[in-house]
Amino acid sequence: MSRRRTPKKRVIAPDALYNSVLVHTIVNHLMKKGKKSLAYMMFYETLSEIKQKTEQDPLEVIQKAVNNVRPLVIVKSRRVSGSTRQVPLSVDYEIGVALAIRWILAACRKRVGKSMISKMTNEFLDASKNIGNAIRKKDEIAKMAQANRAYARF
């Protein structure tokens, strides 16, 4: 265990247009090679497409999608008496949201389609309806945790 002090939690500033920390977090995960303005442009375009398709508040759809994908338990590999076991662990809210965003964006990148904007739109809509590859990933992890719950004490 480290003897150093625990680092301070960084405060994430909300984005300018929607005043939402979640939007800023998603944009940070979406960004590649430091191109934040491109990531913002893509995500704002995704939000406008969601608004056109559903005629609902796009932030509510995004929040619902992230909450649907957010895992409650994950499995971590632990070495126990000479063999490696998958040990289920409960997940904090912030870590769960980060995992959900990562899984949704990974599912977007796997999708077949023309643009990343349309792929993100479809994946967020699917996740808000409890379908799609990100939900499948969450269910897979939950099944693995359920199967290995005997090792939860490690």
Swiss-Prot record:
GO terms for cellular component: chloroplast; small ribosomal subunit. This is Small ribosomal subunit protein uS7c. Its main location: plastid. SUPFAM superfamilies: Ribosomal protein S7. NCBIfam families: rpsG_bact (TIGR01029). One of its GO terms (biological process) is translation. The keyword Lyase does not apply.
